[in-house]
Amino acid sequence: MKFFPVYYFVIPCLIGIVAQVMFYGISTGWASIAIGFVFVSLQLQTFNSFVDDISGLFNRKYFNFYMEKLCKTKRADIYGILLDVNNFKKINDDYGHYVGDGAIRNIGKILSESVPKNAVPMRMAGDEFIIIITDGSEKSTAELKNTIRENINLFNNTTDMPYRLSMAMGTAEFHGESLKEFLLNIDKDMYSDKKEYYLTHER
C-alpha cells in the first residue's frame, strides 16, 4: 500500500486555481493551499501511525489494514513468511536493550533490501516480523527465504557486531481464512523451524 501526500496537496491547489479563473474576483488560491496542507498533514499522520519506530518497517497496525484491503480485493496467490529472531533475549541480556534495538534496526534493513516489489515486510511485535507476498508461489516464497538467509549471513560476516543474527521462518498460503487462523498456521510452521535450530544451537 502506497501513500501519495503530494497528490493531497496538488489537487486542492488546482481546484482553487480553476475556481479563481472561473469566478473572477473571488480569491480561492490561499484557501486551497491551506486545505492542501491540512490533507498532507493528515496523510502523513496516517503514514507515521503505520510505521515502526525502531525497525523502520510497517507495523502490526498496518498488517491488519493491509490484509483487510487484500481480502476485499479477493487477491489470490498470497503467501506469508513469519520470522522470529533466534536467541534475541540473549542479545538483550548480554549486551543491553540499546544493542538489541540496533539488532532490530539491522533486521529491518536486511528485510527491506531482500524483498521484491510484490512483498511487504512488517514488524509484528518484539523480535517477530512478517512478510506478505502478493502474486506469489511456493517457489518464489522459498527463494525469498533463501535470499534472506544469505543476506543475514552476509551481515554476520561483514560487520563487527558482538552478536550473530539468525531467524526462524515459517510460511503459509493465505486462502481467505481469518487472520487469526492464518497466523496460527504460519506460526506453527515457524516454531517447527525454530525447534530444528535449537537442536544444534544453545538457547
Task: List PLM regions with ranges.
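Catalytic-core segments of nucleotide cyclases and related cyclic-nucleotide turnover enzymes
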Residues: 142-149, 153-159, 166-168, 172-203
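Signal-transducing coiled-coil linker helices
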Residues: 2-54, 60-70, 177
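A structural signal for short, well-ordered beta-strand segments
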Residues: 80, 129, 167-171
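Beta-strand residues that line the small-molecule/cofactor-binding core
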Residues: 62, 164-166
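Conserved long alpha-helical elements within nucleotide-processing catalytic cores of c-di-GMP signaling
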Residues: 59-79, 89-116, 122-126, 130, ...
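Short beta-strand-to-loop capping motifs
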Residues: 131-136, 173-174
